[in-house]
From Swiss-Prot:
Organism ancestry: Bacteria, Pseudomonadati, Pseudomonadota, Gammaproteobacteria, Aeromonadales
Superkingdom, taxonomy of origin: Bacteria
Name of the gene encoding the protein in the UniProt record: rlmE
Protein name (Swiss-Prot/TrEMBL): Ribosomal RNA large subunit methyltransferase E
Keyword Cell inner membrane applies: no
Binding site for S-adenosyl-L-methionine: G63, W65, D83, D99, D124
Active-site residue numbers: K164 (proton acceptor)
Disulfide-linked positions: none
GO cellular component, one term: cytoplasm
Reported function: Specifically methylates the uridine in position 2552 of 23S rRNA at the 2'-O position of the ribose in the fully assembled 50S ribosomal subunit.
Family to which this protein belongs: Belongs to the class I-like SAM-binding methyltransferase superfamily. RNA methyltransferase RlmE family.
UniProt subcellular location: Cytoplasm
EC numbers: 2.1.1.166
Chemical reaction(s) catalysed: uridine(2552) in 23S rRNA + S-adenosyl-L-methionine = 2'-O-methyluridine(2552) in 23S rRNA + S-adenosyl-L-homocysteine + H(+)
Amino acid sequence: MSKKKRTASSTRWLKEHFDDKYVQQAQKQGLRSRAVFKIDEIQQKDKLIKQGMTVVDLGAAPGGWSQFCVEQVGPHGRVIACDILPMDPIAGVDFLQGDFREEAVLSALLGRVGEQKVDIILSDMAPNMSGTPAVDQPRSMYLVELALEMCKQVLAAKGSFVVKVFQGAGFEEYLKEVRSLFSVVKIRKPDSSRSRSREVYIVATGFKL
């Protein structure tokens, strides 16, 4: 049987991907994904991650953000990561594979966190995109709501939250909720974020317990 022909959109995506300077840089530097440049840019601007901190990384696979965070927190810090997809081990990262939307997975993740509060929660989660905004946007907003709920459970006073959000239905309401829970809230569009993508990162600091 012959392979199905690629669609025009998938061919365009592949060309964009392999021509992408951040993809090329990630490969040259032995990084797990181009996404590391997003968190690196946020870190350079906002200086959120420090030595000895405890970080939770949601939507971690293939591990670019976790790889970056381990270097930032050092030997006395902790990085706890979760993703529905498998992830090759990273020294210093406690990884849980599972669907964050499931209660059992959330309970297991909270068990990994333990009694100590978390300094930063990072979420780069995104649903499998169907290409239909009326389907994709609610799925995306559900994930970011779950990430915010986790903040309410485990984030330390004055802690930080970085979350990828797609602009669209529910975005303004979500932003308002985040602003009610944190002292300072900024919206970042990293240079490495593809210009035609609706994604932005909400960077929130000063969690109010």
